Amino acid sequence: MLTKRTSEKTSPSGKKVLVTRAGDQATALTVALAEIGVDPVVVPTIEIIPPASFVELDQAIADLDQVDYLILTSANAVNAFFDRLVAQGRNPQALSAIQTVAVGPKSAEALFERGVTADLIPKDYRAEGVVALLKDRVSGKRLLYPKAALARDLIPTELTAAGAKVIAPVAYASAPPVDVAKKLQQALTDGLDLLTFTASSTVQNFVDLLDDQDLGLAKRIPVASIGPLTSATARELGFNVIIEPDNSTLEALVTAIRTYFSGTR
């Protein structure tokens, strides 16, 4: 979805676009934005941290021989799960008899880098896509879904209703980075043409990092959101979402941003 733009055709060149992804994940988006001519301004509003406890995840890893499907909904989930798998003395061969579900190409790529090829990738790169893909094939099956601390309950709820046993340990959490508020304020002062948000948590943390005056300034800047859930959060918090790609991928987001700045359809 791209809303209509009333201004004359312009060029992406020199436009300042805020990147709020986690520091170690911002590179791909930053490079892609630079390639279309914009000036990426990187101020992460989120960092990935360990969960409060690994007890549930460790138990799930110990019981891998009972698992039929492994659901990994992001590169963060892939990395958190495999880091813990290795810490527990296991290796990717432990997954050889398990059907792995990767939500989107980035998750599949992260999985491949760990030595595992995704067996299934839903057409819709969201929790809804996982449910649509699996609901008719998981009755009586045991599913492992290593999730983020603030993940929605859609996958466990819907697939349990479909007859599956869903184990959903928290594999990672997120938090606002320390000492980024001043950098964010400076970016706003210097001027930005577009804000990008790639998760609801990046939006909420952005809001939490700013005082009322700076937040008021920020809300006058148009927003590019990676997908409907992030867009809904941004709108609820008072932002003007004008870009949302049809597919929730970084590539689609960058293409939509280029289209927006070019004033073309």
Predicted segments with their positions:
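Signature of uroporphyrinogen-III synthase
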Residues: 1-265
